[in-house]
């Protein structure tokens, strides 16, 4: 299977973290001794998670357990991409996806207590940026969806009521935060939050084209940004988002 966006000097393995064959045979053949594991590869869709419960089980539970076990056995740090859904009105219980991400944070922290696992937990907020339009499964981030709809000359579809607010972070800022979280020699949590917060209606208006409201989605809820953790993240990582959402949209 051809892998898109393939980089030079990088070895790709087309497998699943839930697959024992990957851990016991494929990875062993590489004789690979990593310094860190950036665990970013999980099932990451909110609404479909009510249907795709088996995928959630395999990817977010079995898969992440295998990654955590690997890091424990190798005595290396795991940098985990948690979800901002944990910081919501329902405390991360509003969907199977959100619940799985919250439980994985607990798993990692407990492995640190029980076995000395080194970790950095990072919370993502609506990433956007280059190549976001390469995803074609229908459940992209809202900025990517709006970009595709605008290029196709279609009205933007806004999930009702449209007044719900979201914070947006450019992928380059997120990557910068991930690297700094790895380099900091502490077990800690970090909110990689951009400086652009707006309602979905306000976001649509930035695209300067027609839009329409569609029905509410199951599992969506109001995010609560913990300002103390945001300020703490900026301080201890010496990190701050530098990209602007409006500037990105204007270039499309």
Predicted regions and their residues:
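Residue-level signal for the nucleotide or nucleotide-sugar donor/cofactor binding architecture
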Residues: 18, 51, 59-62, 95, ...
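Hydrophobic alpha-helical packing elements
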Residues: 22, 26, 56, 100, ...
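NAD(P)-dependent short-chain dehydrogenase/reductase
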Residues: 96-98, 106-166, 171-176, 182, ...
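C-terminal substrate-binding subdomain of Rossmann-fold SDR/epimerase-dehydratase oxidoreductases
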Residues: 150-252
């Amino acid at each position: 299977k051809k892998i898109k966006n393939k980089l030079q000097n990088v070895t790709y393995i087309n497998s699943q973290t839930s697959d024992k064959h990957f851990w016991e045979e494929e990875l062993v053949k590489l004789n690979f001794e990593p310094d860190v594991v950036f665990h970013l590869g999980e099932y990451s869709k909110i609404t479909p998670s009510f249907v795709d419960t088996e995928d959630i089980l395999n990817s977010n539970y079995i898969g992440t357990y295998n990654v955590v076990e690997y890091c424990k056995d190798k005595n290396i740090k795991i940098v985990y991409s948690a979800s901002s859904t944990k910081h919501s009105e329902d405390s991360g219980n509003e969907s199977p996806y959100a619940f799985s991400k919250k439980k994985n944070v607990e798993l990692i922290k407990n492995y640190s207590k029980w076995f000395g696992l080194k970790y950095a937990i990072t919370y993502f907020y609506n990433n956007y940026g280059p190549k976001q339009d390469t995803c074609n499964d229908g459940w992209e981030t809202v900025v990517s969806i709006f970009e595709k709809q605008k290029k196709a000359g279609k009205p933007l579809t806004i999930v009702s009521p449209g007044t719900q607010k979201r914070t947006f972070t450019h992928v380059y800022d997120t990557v910068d935060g991930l690297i700094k979280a790895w380099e900091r020699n502490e077990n800690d949590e970090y909110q990689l939050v951009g400086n652009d917060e707006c309602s979905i209606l306000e976001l649509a208006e930035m695209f300067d084209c027609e839009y329409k409201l569609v029905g509410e989605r199951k599992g969506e809820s109001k995010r609560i940004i913990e300002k103390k953790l945001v300020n703490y993240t900026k301080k201890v990582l010496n990190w701050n988002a530098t990209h602007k959402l409006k500037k990105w949209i204007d270039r499309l």
